[in-house]
C-alpha cells in the first residue's frame, strides 16, 4: 500500500519546497511535523522529508515514533545521491529500506539557532584545508555564497520508487 501523506521538518525552507513539490506531483497531502501531529493518526503510513544535520536526518526519530515511515528523503548541501549510506546508518535503516538524498541549498540568513555559527566554523576549517578537492571547493563556495539547488530532477529516485510501489 502506498503512503498516504508526506511529513517534513525544514529549517530554511528547502526541505519544505521538496516535500511540496513531491506532494504536488503525487497527490499526497503534505504536513510539517507540527501540523501532522494534529492532522494524522498515529501509525499513518508516510514518506518523511528532513534536512541533514551533522550526519543525521532532522526529526526522523520523532517521526518514526509517531508514524509508519515507508521512505526517507534527506535534503543536504551535498550532491543528490551522495549521502544515502550515511543517512541509512544514522537512522538505523536496513539495506532494503528506501532512502534518498537530494541537494537542497544554503541560505545563511535563514539559519535558525546555532546553525549559523556552525556554518561559520565549517567555512574557517575548510578555508584552511590544504589540497582541497574540486568537491571541497564547490562546497566551500556554497557555504560562503549560498545557493539553491531545489529542482524536480533531484527527486527522480524517489519518484521512481513511489511509482513502483
Task: Tell me what each language-model feature is.
Residues 1-66, 160-165:
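N-terminal beta1-alpha1-beta2 submodule of the flavodoxin-like/Rossmannoid cofactor-binding fold
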Residues 52-165:
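FMN-binding flavodoxin-like domain, especially the glycine-rich phosphate-binding loop
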Amino acid at each position: 500500500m502506498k503512503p498516504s501523506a508526506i511529513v517534513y521538518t525544514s529549517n530554511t525552507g528547502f526541505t519544505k519546497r521538496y516535500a511540496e513539490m513531491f506532494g504536488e506531483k503525487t497527490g499526497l497531502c503534505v504536513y510539517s511535523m507540527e501540523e501532522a501531529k494534529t492532522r494524522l493518526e498515529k501509525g499513518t503510513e508516510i514518506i518523511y522529508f528532513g534536512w541533514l544535520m551533522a550526519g543525521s536526518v532532522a526529526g526522523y526519530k520523532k517521526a518514526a515514533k509517531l508514524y509508519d515511515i515507508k521512505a526517507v528523503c534527506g535534503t543536504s548541501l551535498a550532491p543528490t545521491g551522495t549521502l544515502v549510506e550515511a543517512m541509512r546508518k544514522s537512522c538505523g535503516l536496513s539495506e532494503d529500506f528506501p532512502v534518498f538524498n537530494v541537494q537542497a541549498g544554503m541560505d545563511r540568513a535563514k539559519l535558525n539557532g546555532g546553525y549559523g555559527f556552525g556554518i561559520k566554523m565549517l567555512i574557517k576549517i575548510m578555508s584552511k584545508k590544504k589540497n582541497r578537492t574540486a568537491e571541497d571547493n564547490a562546497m566551500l563556495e556554497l557555504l560562503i555564497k549560498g545557493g539553491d539547488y531545489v529542482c524536480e530532477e533531484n527527486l527522480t529516485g524517489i519518484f521512481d520508487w513511489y511509482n513502483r510501489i
